[in-house]
Amino acid sequence: MAGQAASKRRLISRSLQSADICLQHQDYGTAYAHLLLVLTLAPEQKEALKEMFQYSLFKWAEELYALNRSQDLFNCYEQALELFPIDDVICNSMGEHLFRLGFRDEAAGYFYKALKLNPSSAEAKENFYRVANWLIERWHFIMLNDTKRNLMYRAAIQNAIQNGCKTVLDIGTGTGILSMFAKKAGAPFVYACELSKTMYELACEIVTANQMDGHIKLLHMKSHDIQIPEHIPERVSLVVTETVDAGLFGEGIVETLIHAWKNLLLQPKPKDGRVEAYGKVIPSSAVIYGMAVECPEIRRHYSVGVTEVAGIKLGDAVKFCSPIHSSHGPDDVTEPYTTEKMSRVPGGYKALSQPFQVMTVDFNSLQALEYIASGKSNRISVPVYQQGQFDCFITWFALQLDNEHSLSTEPSEETCWEQAVFPVQKLPDEGCLVNTGDTIVVDVSCPDCYLRLDLSTIVLSESSCDQTENMVMGNETDICDALANLHTTTNKGNMQELCILEPGEIALLNNAVYHESFMAAISKVIGSLELKESCSVVRNSQEQDVNFAQPVSEDRLHVLDVSEGFSILPLIAAKLGKVKAFSSVEKEQHRVALEKLSVINDLNNNESLEFCLSQLETDDGAAQKPKSDKMWSIIILDVIETCGLIRQDLLEKAAIARCLLEPGGKIFPHAVVMQGMLIESKTLLHEGSVQGNEPTLGFLIAPFINRFKVPAHVFLNLSTVPCIPLSEQFELLRLDLMNPCSNNQSSSVMRIKVNICRSGQVTAVTFWYHIHIDEAISLDTSSEASHWKQAAYVLETPTCVLEGEELLLEVQFQNSSMSMKLTRPLQ
């Protein structure tokens, strides 16, 4: 026995030495194997060797990932978790690999476990919030908090069961609430299907918590995959579903119900006879309504309304448009509409027409559903009753659950649904002014079971024809010509290049203040360079005969723009002269558009613009210096995401950028100041978590789905979010990208004193940014022209406050993620 123990000790010692040597030589796989052996033989050394083991595991896992050896990667993590079952760092790392390989449900489980093991882990928290947004979309909370919607569905289901429906199938059950309505109403047999693994597991928990397990059969599958009698014993008499989006058809209700009527439902009740067993659907029918609308906010996100930006002519060579109308092909996966809560759109909107009926849908008629799926088009003439700029169609629907109960999603209704918005893009860049008496002709179709509204023509009234000089389009022929000219290619020299931009990128292109501010800041740097050169010439002429003076340097400023997405800042910089600008655009379409614009603006002959995607990224994703030995004069960083959050790894990117600047070089912007305000907002509460059992009519759902709540609410328009300000604005955070030593987040937690200016209940901290390009020029992301949205952090527990109180807001900022907590100072 003594000999075996000594042999074991020698093996452990040799393996440990070998692991150390392997790590020095970056042989991470062998090092991991040696350490695994050591810890298996000597578990008492786990604590001492934990960091070394983690390092070798993570490095080896990265190599396995690069080699596409996913199974070996997961085997390593399973071995590691056997040794360290409660290690939050390993759990979090395992989740990261699962997420990047597409296993989001499984990743969520590991992130959640890591967060439970270490609630203060910023990495695990950020990862869990990110995956939670993927798995449980925010509309689940809004829908479950919609008491009226829940009451109407419950009443309609009760009526159906009282009228003889005995077998119920809930398609797309989500949390299972409709199934529980059916069971509580007395349905003998209730089945429910859900495709999402996370939602299915959540529904299982919820059904069990409400003492209905064994009474509701939950199926983890699409309804299209349900087989009789393998999954359910027979055809059902009632299908309940809420697979409808703002455009009604976007979640596939038409295809789903066509399949259900053919394979899962009893035959519908005949109109001229009475049968004991028949099939029906809740909702029974719907009417879609539409309206032509003027809306400046929609316009600036979906139509480029400027011909020149900070000295850069946009011209006619490039046609910018959003993805929504860029393609109508059979393989196009882009929804033909966006969605908005029209009652909350900044600046509001103006109705140019009365509401018109787009189409009616009978969900209890297989023939009606198949007609919709056929994609046949219907043309509707819409009279204009009020003059305005025609920007978009909006649609909403009235959902008839049964003969007695209905729901409406019209803009004036307080409902969980938004409205569908169809920006009109088949118009000249100047837009389209319509007058009272004109007629807008629209084609309505569902070629891929998505609702589409396409502008056909605008027929002018006689009074409008008399004012054609004031109109963008004089008659129907002009419009047809404009529509024909829209879809062009670059096959001919004079044709437009199509460049597809996201709505945020279009709003950025329309943001004149943004571009002019950067132009002014770059101009100041060029001016200071010219002053230095002038002083150099004077010194040289004083020191020697002017004929032998050294020539002025012809070196140009090297400006690197690493903005995300499409950016014309390199063109603006190059246009100023004495600048060689580098663009890091990634999409070929964007690069071609910038090249076209450089030709229009006479920047193509002197090599003022260069694309540096190949130079931009190192193995670590860091910016490199130019091809020449010269360092960067200006590096432009994209610091704030359009959604309203600080970009991930901003401080790390700024640190790399500082190392690549020439002496006197600058990072634009040089500083970011986060501004905040305490508010009371029931709306944000309802959009972020289920508010107890009352809105869900007594069912226990909130504790389960609220595990997936995320405190940061993004893409907000603070000017229209229903809220009550309870404090003045105050500085939350300051990030100096040029001088990191002056940043105020040096400690792990910052404590900010906030004075309460109004009594109420603090539910959230809204925030936005002042972006300081240089010491004198700044941008406000909350301004009316801003292309950035704002954000809010919803507090874990609302706090009642009194006017005149002083509270402490604890802010933790780490790795570009943030958490906040409101407390009262100790007396």
Curated annotation (Swiss-Prot):
EC number: 2.1.1.320
Segments forming domain SAM-dependent MTase PRMT-type: 124-453, 511-827
Top-rank lineage group of the source organism: Eukaryota
InterPro entries: Arg_MeTrfase, PRMT_dom, SAM-dependent_MTases_sf, TPR-like_helical_dom_sf, TPR_rpt
Reactions the enzyme catalyzes: L-arginyl-[protein] + 2 S-adenosyl-L-methionine = N(omega),N(omega)'-dimethyl-L-arginyl-[protein] + 2 S-adenosyl-L-homocysteine + 2 H(+)
Pfam families: PrmA, PRMT_C
One of the GO BP terms on file: mRNA processing
Stated name of the protein: Protein arginine N-methyltransferase 9
Species assigned in the record: Xenopus laevis (African clawed frog)
Upper lineage: Eukaryota, Metazoa, Chordata, Craniata, Vertebrata
Gene from which this protein is expressed: prmt9
